[in-house]
Amino acid sequence: MRASLDTNVIIHLYRAELQGILFDLFDEGVFIYEQIRSMELEHHGQDILTKVDSDINAGKIELFTDQKLKDLAVYKMFENNVRENRILYNAGDLGEVYAISLAQTIGAYSLVTDDTKQGGPYMSLLQLDYDIMPFTFADVLILRYLMGIVDAEQTVEDFELVNNQSQLNWSFRSQISKFI
């Protein structure tokens, strides 16, 4: 699978030292747009930036710049996707808009985000007929369990680690209910 990442999920998984889950599950590519790296993470994730940059340099995360999109002859498509998604999802969270737009443009088919507000991209992508499947960090952990990569105990332990490191106050039971 291929995935485009939103800002918060990057921060949550890196703070818990569980970023490797992304590379294991999305073995065909993990992608971020340059603005998520240069603006969003610079402002909200300075504590994990060195690790993210290391993974970009190691080729674990593919960073898409405007120039790279132009070289692939898809920059105008990306711009159109950004414009449409800003209207659909409110320009308040550009990280989400960029992550969705990148997924649409390059055919990533998976969006990993932790923004599950009503009317937001996660809920809309689940309810409407889109080619992109949204996942939260909890969804990724549950998928990893269902694929037999880890057992239930490890899944719960990892959920609690991310939940506590990022002070999310999420309930694992409610995340399982949403997943089902």
Question: What are the roles of these predicted feature ranges?
Answer:
Residues 1-106, 118-180:
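Active-site-proximal, substrate-binding regions of enzyme catalytic domains
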Residues 109:
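Short acidic/polar active-site loop segments enriched in Thr and Asp
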